[in-house]
Amino acid sequence: MENKMEYEIKEETLVVYFYGEIDGSNVSLYRNKLNVILAMNEDDVIFDFKHTTFIDSAGVGLVLGRYQQLSKEGRKLAVSRLSNTAYKVFELSGLFEIMEYLKEAQI
């Protein structure tokens, strides 16, 4: 699966879809693209990981960094459709204490 990112606006929420892997080898590319997308939009954000096959600590750092950026702007970030393994990583990292996890039906 190709590593890529797509986005759309759904009901005044920016939904960003990640495909493939998010790791140290590509996280800076994702960060740069996200900075452009987030700057063009003032909506709350959902990161959808349904098609993400792997995420490491660099990917978790990417999510945390965007959360901090959006929080400073008064915006919310939620994550959705993590694999079981990624869900455990996010949970152990304490990310669900600061951001919401959405199930598929909530998107």
Predicted features along the sequence, with ranges:
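ABC-family nucleotide-binding domains
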Residues: D56
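STAS-like cytosolic regulatory interaction modules
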Residues: M1-T53, Y67-I107
